[in-house]
Swiss-Prot record:
This is ATP synthase subunit b, chloroplastic. InterPro entries: ATP_synth_b/b'su_bac/chlpt (IPR002146). F-type ATPases have 2 components, F(1) - the catalytic core - and F(0) - the membrane proton channel. F(1) has five subunits: alpha(3), beta(3), gamma(1), delta(1), epsilon(1). F(0) has four main subunits: a(1), b(1), b'(1) and c(10-14). The alpha and beta chains form an alternating ring which encloses part of the gamma chain. F(1) is attached to F(0) by a central stalk formed by the gamma and epsilon chains, while a peripheral stalk is formed by the delta, b and b' chains. The chain crosses the membrane at residues 27-49. GO terms for molecular function: proton-transporting ATP synthase activity, rotational mechanism. It is found in: Plastid, Chloroplast thylakoid membrane. PANTHER family: ATP SYNTHASE SUBUNIT B, CHLOROPLASTIC. It comes from the Eukaryota. Its main location: plastid. GO terms for cellular component: chloroplast thylakoid membrane; proton-transporting ATP synthase complex. F(1)F(0) ATP synthase produces ATP from ADP in the presence of a proton or sodium gradient. F-type ATPases consist of two structural domains, F(1) containing the extramembraneous catalytic core and F(0) containing the membrane proton channel, linked together by a central stalk and a peripheral stalk. During catalysis, ATP synthesis in the catalytic domain of F(1) is coupled via a rotary mechanism of the central stalk subunits to proton translocation.
Length: 184
């Protein structure tokens, strides 16, 4: 606030005409001083400002160029992605159609396989039953044969006495002897 009041005071109080100097008080300066300051600023600041503006312009142009390249790359990638998406959708549709066909085919194969397995199980069951029947029949035959043999042996043992036994042995010896002579 003091600077503002000093400025107004300096407006009221003009310096003496014989002095020469640089007046920093902007309200107390004359147009010549202002034009000198502005001329110096324009002369020296023009190159700096021009360089700054040129650099800024180049950076903006480079940024625009890079953005255009990135945009073109993004558009190209987008087109590739769309083409890939379309290929994948076609492939997925093919898999879906093949999947439905495959599922139906697998269902038929599974049903046929189940029927074949059931037939094999039925055949195995029938073979097992037949085998068990044959085994039971063979066991019964063997038991009947053993009982018949035991009965025959019992009958022979009870019917044979020593004399009949000796005559049978003698007859067999004679029979074997005659067979031996025929073969010699």
């Amino acid at each position: 606030m003091k600077n503002v009041t000093d400025s107004f005071v300096s407006l009221v109080h003009w310096p003496s005409a014989g002095s020469f100097g640089f007046n920093t008080d902007i309200l107390a300066t004359n147009p010549i001083n202002l034009s000198v300051v502005l001329g110096v600023l324009i002369f020296f600041g023009k190159g700096v400002l021009s360089d700054l503006l040129d650099n800024r312009k180049q950076r903006i142009l480079n940024t625009i160029r890079n953005s255009e390249e990135l945009r073109e790359g993004a558009i190209e990638q987008l087109e590739k992605a769309r083409a890939r998406l379309q290929d994948v959708q076609i492939e997925a549709e093919g898999y879906r159609a093949y999947g439905y066909f495959g599922i139906d085919e697998q269902r038929h194969e599974s049903i046929n396989s189940t029927y074949k397995t059931l037939e094999q199980l039925e055949n195995n069951k029938n073979e097992s039953i037949h085998f068990e029947q044959q085994r039971a029949i063979n066991q019964v035959r063997q038991q009947i044969f053993q009982q018949a043999l035991q009965g025959a042996l019992g009958t022979l043992n009870s019917c044979l006495n020593n004399e009949l036994h000796l005559r049978t042995i003698s007859a067999n010896i004679v029979l074997f002897g005659s067979m031996k002579e025929l073969t010699d």
